[in-house]
Regions:
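Structured segments of extracytoplasmic/periplasmic soluble domains
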Residues: 9-19, 36-44, 65-72, 109-119, ...
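Second-shell loop/turn segments in exported
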Residues: 1, 19-24, 51-53, 92-103, ...
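A mature extracytoplasmic/lumenal domain signature
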Residues: 26, 58, 124-126, 153-155, ...
Length: 198
């Protein structure tokens, strides 16, 4: 891998809203971004590249996948884009905004759910710990691990039921019952959990 390859990776990451320093080095945040990309890219194998080795090294296959992803508008899967999951806490890059944490199981579950519920609109995906604290999120929020999304129920054709969410592979389900803010929280935490917002 050359400095030019690493610079390409950094520009690509920034096109997704990550905010890496463009220095052509394989530093901590560049490696972390590469690992996340390698782990999540090709869910549903929509481009034919296949699974990538998750090693944080942008080899030829990873670079090819990044170029395809860029040409496809930054898609992480057939129906979802990386930008939909990014931290919305700040437009100014900070240490906490240099990453998009995103678990493969989360995106796979969203693809399965979309098959039965139709188009899905993500209100919130990954949150940096700093942003999560600022909005009053719980300290162990699954959003900070890239395992959770909040969906706009009002923008969907049909209401997602708990049964549909569980069948799609979501273990954490939180349903908003206030009429002024209709969202559903879904996550892929290790232990099944359900709650209602009041």
């Amino acid at each position: 891998m050359t400095n030019a390859d690493l610079t390409e990776v950094q520009y690509f990451a920034n096109s997704l809203g990550v905010g890496l320093t463009i220095d052509g080095r394989n530093g901590y945040f560049t490696r972390r971004f590469c690992k996340m990309f390698q782990d999540t890219f090709q869910i549903g194998d929509y481009s034919g590249v296949g699974r990538l080795v998750v090693d944080g090294i942008p080899g030829p296959k990873t670079l090819e996948a990044m170029r395809i992803c860029k040409a496809e508008g930054g898609r992480v899967s057939r129906h979802f884009h990386y930008k939909e999951f990014r931290n919305k806490g700040s437009l100014t890059p900070t240490v906490s905004n240099h990453v998009i944490r995103l678990e493969r199981e989360l995106v796979e579950g969203l693809e399965r759910l979309r098959k039965v519920a139709g188009p899905i609109h993500i209100a919130s995906g990954y949150r940096s710990p700093v942003h999560n604290r600022a909005i009053g999120g719980v300290s162990n929020s699954q959003h900070t691990y890239g395992r959770a999304v909040d969906l706009h129920r009002s923008r969907m054709r049909s209401n997602v039921t708990e049964a549909q969410a569980r069948a799609a592979g979501f273990s954490g389900v939180g349903i908003e019952s206030r009429s002024n803010n209709s969202v559903i929280h879904l996550d892929v935490r290790p232990t099944p959990t359900r709650w209602y917002y009041r």
